[in-house]
Protein backbone atom coordinates (compact mmCIF):
# COMPACT_ATOMS: atom_id res chain seq x y z
CA UNK A 1 0.00 0.00 0.00
CA UNK A 2 1.48 3.36 -1.09
CA UNK A 3 -1.34 5.83 -0.47
CA UNK A 4 -4.95 5.87 0.72
CA UNK A 5 -7.83 8.09 -0.31
CA UNK A 6 -10.55 9.02 2.15
CA UNK A 7 -13.68 10.82 1.03
CA UNK A 8 -15.26 10.97 4.49
CA UNK A 9 -18.93 11.16 5.45
CA UNK A 10 -20.67 14.16 3.90
CA UNK A 11 -22.76 16.00 6.49
CA UNK A 12 -23.37 19.17 4.48
CA UNK A 13 -22.92 20.14 0.85
CA UNK A 14 -24.07 23.62 -0.19
CA UNK A 15 -22.38 24.48 -3.49
CA UNK A 16 -24.53 27.48 -4.43
CA UNK A 17 -24.74 31.01 -3.09
CA UNK A 18 -22.13 33.59 -2.10
CA UNK A 19 -20.35 31.28 0.38
CA UNK A 20 -20.24 27.72 -0.99
CA UNK A 21 -19.48 25.13 1.67
CA UNK A 22 -19.04 21.41 2.09
CA UNK A 23 -18.09 19.26 5.06
CA UNK A 24 -17.00 15.63 5.19
CA UNK A 25 -16.28 13.96 8.53
CA UNK A 26 -13.27 11.71 9.02
CA UNK A 27 -9.88 12.79 10.38
CA UNK A 28 -7.11 11.63 7.98
CA UNK A 29 -4.40 11.89 10.66
CA UNK A 30 -5.76 8.79 12.39
CA UNK A 31 -5.89 6.89 9.11
CA UNK A 32 -2.31 7.87 8.26
CA UNK A 33 -1.18 6.76 11.70
CA UNK A 34 -2.99 3.43 11.44
CA UNK A 35 -2.09 2.64 7.82
CA UNK A 36 1.46 4.01 7.78
CA UNK A 37 0.99 5.65 4.36
CA UNK A 38 0.01 9.14 3.18
CA UNK A 39 -3.73 9.80 3.15
CA UNK A 40 -5.42 12.13 0.67
CA UNK A 41 -8.73 13.58 1.83
CA UNK A 42 -11.00 16.62 1.54
CA UNK A 43 -11.26 16.46 -2.25
CA UNK A 44 -14.27 18.71 -2.81
CA UNK A 45 -13.20 22.16 -1.47
CA UNK A 46 -10.49 22.78 -4.10
CA UNK A 47 -13.00 22.23 -6.88
CA UNK A 48 -15.41 24.63 -5.18
CA UNK A 49 -12.65 27.21 -4.73
CA UNK A 50 -12.21 27.06 -8.51
CA UNK A 51 -15.89 27.86 -9.02
CA UNK A 52 -17.15 24.29 -9.25
CA UNK A 53 -19.91 22.49 -7.40
CA UNK A 54 -17.45 20.11 -5.72
CA UNK A 55 -19.51 17.27 -7.18
CA UNK A 56 -19.89 14.89 -8.79
CA UNK A 57 -16.36 13.52 -8.56
CA UNK A 58 -17.05 10.11 -10.09
CA UNK A 59 -17.10 11.21 -13.78
CA UNK A 60 -13.29 11.41 -13.65
CA UNK A 61 -13.12 7.73 -12.70
CA UNK A 62 -15.71 6.85 -15.34
CA UNK A 63 -13.65 8.54 -18.04
CA UNK A 64 -10.49 6.79 -16.82
CA UNK A 65 -12.14 3.33 -16.91
CA UNK A 66 -14.71 3.63 -19.71
CA UNK A 67 -13.38 6.51 -21.82
CA UNK A 68 -11.90 4.26 -24.53
CA UNK A 69 -15.11 2.28 -25.02
CA UNK A 70 -18.39 3.12 -26.76
CA UNK A 71 -20.47 5.99 -25.34
CA UNK A 72 -22.11 4.90 -22.11
CA UNK A 73 -24.01 6.56 -19.32
CA UNK A 74 -22.56 5.44 -15.98
CA UNK A 75 -25.07 5.74 -13.17
CA UNK A 76 -23.94 5.60 -9.57
CA UNK A 77 -26.79 5.23 -7.09
CA UNK A 78 -25.65 6.07 -3.58
CA UNK A 79 -27.56 8.36 -1.25
CA UNK A 80 -27.70 10.77 -4.17
CA UNK A 81 -27.69 9.48 -7.75
CA UNK A 82 -25.19 10.83 -10.26
CA UNK A 83 -24.66 10.15 -13.94
CA UNK A 84 -21.59 10.37 -16.17
CA UNK A 85 -21.40 10.30 -19.95
CA UNK A 86 -18.12 8.78 -21.13
CA UNK A 87 -16.73 7.01 -24.17
CA UNK A 88 -15.07 7.48 -27.53
CA UNK A 89 -16.02 10.62 -29.39
CA UNK A 90 -17.91 12.28 -26.53
CA UNK A 91 -16.90 14.95 -24.05
CA UNK A 92 -17.12 13.47 -20.59
CA UNK A 93 -19.49 15.26 -18.28
CA UNK A 94 -21.66 14.39 -15.31
CA UNK A 95 -24.18 15.68 -12.81
CA UNK A 96 -26.41 14.66 -9.93
CA UNK A 97 -29.68 13.33 -11.31
CA UNK A 98 -31.63 13.48 -8.04
CA UNK A 99 -32.30 11.19 -5.09
CA UNK A 100 -30.62 7.81 -5.06
CA UNK A 101 -31.13 5.62 -2.02
CA UNK A 102 -31.87 8.48 0.40
CA UNK A 103 -35.66 8.67 -0.09
CA UNK A 104 -36.11 4.92 -0.36
CA UNK A 105 -34.13 4.36 2.85
CA UNK A 106 -36.14 7.01 4.71
CA UNK A 107 -39.37 5.43 3.48
CA UNK A 108 -38.27 1.97 4.61
CA UNK A 109 -37.44 3.27 8.09
CA UNK A 110 -40.71 5.20 8.35
CA UNK A 111 -42.89 2.34 7.13
CA UNK A 112 -41.21 -0.25 9.37
CA UNK A 113 -41.16 1.89 12.50
CA UNK A 114 -37.38 1.91 12.37
CA UNK A 115 -36.93 -1.85 12.02
CA UNK A 116 -35.64 -1.63 8.44
CA UNK A 117 -32.66 0.51 7.48
CA UNK A 118 -33.49 0.03 3.80
CA UNK A 119 -35.73 -1.98 1.47
CA UNK A 120 -33.42 -4.97 0.99
CA UNK A 121 -33.38 -5.98 -2.66
CA UNK A 122 -36.47 -3.84 -3.25
CA UNK A 123 -38.63 -6.61 -1.73
CA UNK A 124 -41.24 -4.25 -0.28
CA UNK A 125 -41.51 -2.14 -3.44
CA UNK A 126 -41.87 -5.23 -5.63
CA UNK A 127 -45.06 -6.14 -3.75
CA UNK A 128 -46.67 -2.74 -4.30
CA UNK A 129 -48.18 -0.67 -7.10
CA UNK A 130 -46.66 2.79 -7.68
CA UNK A 131 -48.68 5.97 -7.95
CA UNK A 132 -47.09 7.00 -11.25
CA UNK A 133 -49.08 10.23 -11.57
CA UNK A 134 -47.83 11.49 -8.20
CA UNK A 135 -44.25 10.65 -9.12
CA UNK A 136 -44.44 12.32 -12.53
CA UNK A 137 -45.97 15.45 -11.04
CA UNK A 138 -42.82 15.94 -8.94
CA UNK A 139 -40.66 16.24 -12.06
CA UNK A 140 -41.90 19.84 -12.18
CA UNK A 141 -39.67 20.72 -9.23
CA UNK A 142 -36.98 23.23 -10.31
CA UNK A 143 -33.94 21.00 -9.73
CA UNK A 144 -34.92 18.51 -12.40
CA UNK A 145 -35.10 21.08 -15.21
CA UNK A 146 -31.94 22.92 -14.14
CA UNK A 147 -29.14 22.34 -16.59
CA UNK A 148 -25.84 20.75 -15.47
CA UNK A 149 -23.43 21.22 -13.85
CA UNK A 150 -25.51 20.66 -10.74
CA UNK A 151 -25.17 18.78 -7.47
CA UNK A 152 -27.29 18.01 -4.44
CA UNK A 153 -27.15 17.72 -0.70
CA UNK A 154 -29.21 14.74 0.47
CA UNK A 155 -31.10 17.03 2.87
CA UNK A 156 -32.92 18.41 -0.18
CA UNK A 157 -34.59 15.00 -0.42
CA UNK A 158 -34.87 14.36 3.29
CA UNK A 159 -37.60 13.46 5.76
CA UNK A 160 -39.48 16.70 5.15
CA UNK A 161 -39.64 16.05 1.41
CA UNK A 162 -40.83 12.49 2.01
CA UNK A 163 -43.59 13.55 4.42
CA UNK A 164 -44.75 16.40 2.17
CA UNK A 165 -44.85 14.57 -1.15
CA UNK A 166 -45.40 10.93 -0.10
CA UNK A 167 -47.98 10.92 2.71
CA UNK A 168 -48.81 7.52 4.18
CA UNK A 169 -52.54 8.09 4.53
CA UNK A 170 -54.58 5.86 2.25
CA UNK A 171 -51.55 3.93 0.99
CA UNK A 172 -50.34 0.48 1.91
CA UNK A 173 -46.65 0.29 2.91
CA UNK A 174 -45.96 -1.70 -0.25
CA UNK A 175 -47.64 0.86 -2.52
CA UNK A 176 -45.87 3.79 -0.87
CA UNK A 177 -42.49 2.06 -1.15
CA UNK A 178 -43.22 1.24 -4.78
CA UNK A 179 -44.09 4.89 -5.46
CA UNK A 180 -40.90 6.24 -3.88
CA UNK A 181 -38.83 3.68 -5.78
CA UNK A 182 -40.58 4.49 -9.05
CA UNK A 183 -39.98 8.21 -8.47
CA UNK A 184 -36.26 7.54 -7.95
CA UNK A 185 -36.06 5.58 -11.22
CA UNK A 186 -38.13 8.21 -13.01
CA UNK A 187 -35.79 11.06 -12.04
CA UNK A 188 -32.84 9.13 -13.49
CA UNK A 189 -34.61 8.32 -16.76
CA UNK A 190 -35.90 11.89 -17.05
CA UNK A 191 -32.39 13.28 -16.55
CA UNK A 192 -31.10 11.14 -19.42
CA UNK A 193 -33.81 12.37 -21.77
CA UNK A 194 -33.19 16.00 -20.87
CA UNK A 195 -29.40 16.12 -20.67
CA UNK A 196 -27.67 12.91 -21.87
CA UNK A 197 -29.45 11.61 -24.96
CA UNK A 198 -29.28 14.99 -26.78
CA UNK A 199 -25.46 14.88 -26.44
CA UNK A 200 -24.65 11.37 -27.59
CA UNK A 201 -25.96 8.14 -28.99
CA UNK A 202 -25.51 6.03 -25.89
CA UNK A 203 -24.96 2.28 -26.23
CA UNK A 204 -26.03 1.33 -22.70
CA UNK A 205 -26.44 2.42 -19.10
CA UNK A 206 -24.24 0.86 -16.41
CA UNK A 207 -25.43 0.96 -12.79
CA UNK A 208 -23.31 0.92 -9.63
CA UNK A 209 -23.72 1.71 -5.95
CA UNK A 210 -26.14 0.27 -3.43
CA UNK A 211 -29.13 1.16 -5.60
CA UNK A 212 -27.95 -1.28 -8.26
CA UNK A 213 -28.72 -4.09 -5.77
CA UNK A 214 -32.37 -3.00 -5.52
CA UNK A 215 -34.31 -5.21 -7.95
CA UNK A 216 -37.37 -2.96 -7.96
CA UNK A 217 -35.28 0.07 -8.88
CA UNK A 218 -33.35 -1.78 -11.59
CA UNK A 219 -36.54 -3.20 -13.10
CA UNK A 220 -38.08 0.26 -13.05
CA UNK A 221 -35.10 1.72 -14.87
CA UNK A 222 -35.16 -1.03 -17.48
CA UNK A 223 -38.83 -0.35 -18.19
CA UNK A 224 -38.40 3.42 -18.32
CA UNK A 225 -35.26 3.32 -20.49
CA UNK A 226 -36.31 0.53 -22.88
CA UNK A 227 -34.88 -0.25 -25.43
CA UNK A 228 -31.61 1.07 -23.95
CA UNK A 229 -29.77 -1.86 -22.30
CA UNK A 230 -29.26 -1.40 -18.55
CA UNK A 231 -26.36 -3.37 -17.06
CA UNK A 232 -24.70 -3.65 -13.65
CA UNK A 233 -21.05 -2.66 -13.24
CA UNK A 234 -20.24 -6.16 -11.97
CA UNK A 235 -20.50 -7.19 -15.65
CA UNK A 236 -17.22 -5.28 -16.06
CA UNK A 237 -15.45 -6.87 -13.10
CA UNK A 238 -16.12 -4.08 -10.60
CA UNK A 239 -18.22 -4.83 -7.52
CA UNK A 240 -21.19 -2.42 -7.32
CA UNK A 241 -20.16 -1.15 -3.88
CA UNK A 242 -16.47 -0.84 -4.83
CA UNK A 243 -16.73 1.84 -7.52
CA UNK A 244 -16.61 4.87 -5.22
CA UNK A 245 -13.74 3.48 -3.09
CA UNK A 246 -11.85 2.70 -6.32
CA UNK A 247 -12.46 6.26 -7.50
CA UNK A 248 -11.05 7.68 -4.26
CA UNK A 249 -7.99 5.43 -4.57
CA UNK A 250 -7.38 6.66 -8.12
CA UNK A 251 -7.80 10.30 -7.13
CA UNK A 252 -5.43 9.85 -4.19
CA UNK A 253 -2.75 8.17 -6.30
CA UNK A 254 -2.86 11.01 -8.81
CA UNK A 255 -2.91 13.71 -6.12
CA UNK A 256 0.40 12.59 -4.59
CA UNK A 257 1.91 12.77 -8.08
CA UNK A 258 0.52 16.27 -8.62
CA UNK A 259 -1.69 15.15 -11.49
CA UNK A 260 -5.19 16.29 -12.43
CA UNK A 261 -7.81 14.15 -10.69
CA UNK A 262 -11.24 15.57 -11.45
CA UNK A 263 -13.50 16.44 -14.37
CA UNK A 264 -14.19 20.21 -14.44
CA UNK A 265 -16.79 19.70 -17.17
CA UNK A 266 -18.85 17.77 -14.62
CA UNK A 267 -18.41 20.11 -11.66
CA UNK A 268 -18.34 23.46 -13.44
CA UNK A 269 -14.87 24.41 -12.16
CA UNK A 270 -12.97 27.06 -14.11
CA UNK A 271 -10.29 24.58 -15.06
CA UNK A 272 -8.51 21.37 -14.15
CA UNK A 273 -7.01 21.18 -10.67
CA UNK A 274 -5.39 18.68 -8.30
CA UNK A 275 -7.94 17.95 -5.59
CA UNK A 276 -7.28 16.77 -2.06
CA UNK A 277 -5.15 17.52 0.99
CA UNK A 278 -2.27 15.20 1.79
CA UNK A 279 -1.58 13.99 5.31
CA UNK A 280 1.91 12.43 5.41
CA UNK A 281 2.46 9.02 7.00
Model-derived features: positions:
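Short beta-strand-loop/turn "lid" adjacent to the catalytic site in phosphate-handling enzymes
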Residues: 1-26
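Phosphate-binding/catalytic loop of phosphoryl-transfer enzymes
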Residues: 15-22, 33, 37-116, 274
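Conserved ATP-utilizing enzyme core subdomain
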Residues: 93-185, 189, 258, 267, ...
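Glycine-rich phosphate-binding loops at beta-strand->alpha-helix junctions
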Residues: 202-222
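Conserved phosphate-binding/catalytic loops in two-lobed NTP-binding clefts
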Residues: 222-247
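Alpha-helix capping/hinge segments and adjacent helical runs
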Residues: 248-262
Amino acid sequence: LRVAGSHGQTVIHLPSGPSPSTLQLGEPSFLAEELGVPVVSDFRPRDMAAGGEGAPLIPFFDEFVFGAGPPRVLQNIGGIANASLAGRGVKTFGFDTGPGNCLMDLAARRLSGGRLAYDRGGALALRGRPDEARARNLLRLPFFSRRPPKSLDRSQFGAGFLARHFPSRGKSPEDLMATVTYFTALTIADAYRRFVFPRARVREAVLSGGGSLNRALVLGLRRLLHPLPVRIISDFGIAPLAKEPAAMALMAALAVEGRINHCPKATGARGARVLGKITPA
